[in-house]
Amino acid sequence: MTTIAIVGAGFVADYYMTTLANHSGLRLGGVWDHDAARLRQFTAFHGIKAYGSLEQCMEDPDVAIVVNLTNPESHFALNCAALEAGKHVYCEKPLGMSYDEARHVIDLARDKGLTVCGAPANGLSDAKRLTAQLIEAGRIGKPRLAYAEMEDGPVFKDNWTEWRSRSGAKWPGLHEFEVGCTLEHAGYGLSWLVALFGPVERGQAFSALTFPDKGPGTHSLSLAADFSVGCLTFQSGVTARLTCGLAAPRDRSLTIVGDEGTIVVRDLWDDRSPVHLRRFDRKPPLLQRLASRFERQRGRALPLRLTLGKPVAYPFPASAETLSSFPSRIDFARGIAAMADALNKGETPFFSGLRALHLSELALALNDGVGSFEPQSRF
């Protein structure tokens, strides 16, 4: 049994509480948040302990892992404070707001013999496991190209001010617009790409603020880029394009093209997403052939797009009984559980150390639109 403490009781914290039930090896020691009213609301809803102060949380002798769910600007300071207190850290993305901050966190953990892991946990999902199995089995031959989409749709045109978490937290829209969709969400694509294809050797990054007016309350804010695209070359030879945005229609799919076929993961925010396989040496499914014939005869594209290939049946049972509600069908607590399990076995967690640093560095480069770059981090 590994005892954890959560710092930050905002919107995302309810996702962690929902999925904590999947992991009997984790015990929640308590929660702290600087907003006393929000802390009372959160702990009362979930029936859990509230720490009286951050110091009390850090000094809890039972706590092995501090889970950092604060806003991104606070990640660096809190990560360092937890490490100085002798705690392992599981941090929401990114580890810091600059490469130097993220690097300092990883170096500090190494010097103190501690471990830092980074979210998100969808890179540990059943869908990623199935996709990796298909690639390793040679079902599409050698993978050459990947397209990862992380488009959230025009969120700022939605009724986002009314969105609430299970325990009543408001969705922090204004702050999300200030931080930007890339730092918030690029990790959901990057975690898959890095897990499947290894470290990035070089890349091209572009970002822009395409909608400077995001409605009431935003006019006095310094808004971050709401669109970014990164073209990444991996040391394994794979080329990938990752797009993040807050305006184009929602699309969180991943397409991988190999010498002999394609894999399409319909939704990276769904741990059991349908995964489609198409082999170039086999006919497409009947419905896809009929759709193609109809389009040729009519000379016009259909008003809907079918996912290429046949859905692949999962050869193993679901690893989580409870997932967060759509559209975030992710076992958020799985990353913490995987970290605890590895530490208890004396192993290195997958998304820790230099790999976690690499993911933060890539997200920061995409968000900043740095142009040509070569990552400093390696693993």
How does the language model describe each region?
Residues M1-H46:
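N-terminal Rossmann-like dinucleotide-binding module
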Residues N122-L221:
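Predominantly a Rossmann-like dinucleotide-binding segment in NAD(P)-dependent oxidoreductases
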Residues D60, A64-I65, N71-P72, F76-G123, ...:
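Beta-strand-loop-alpha-helix segment that lines the small-molecule cofactor/substrate pocket
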Residues K49-P61:
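Short acidic low-complexity segments
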Residues D158-K170, F280-T322:
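Charged, glycine/proline-rich intrinsically disordered loops and linkers
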Residues E184, G189-R282, A333-K345, A363-A365:
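Contiguous beta-strand/loop segments that form the cofactor/metal-binding neighborhood of enzyme cores
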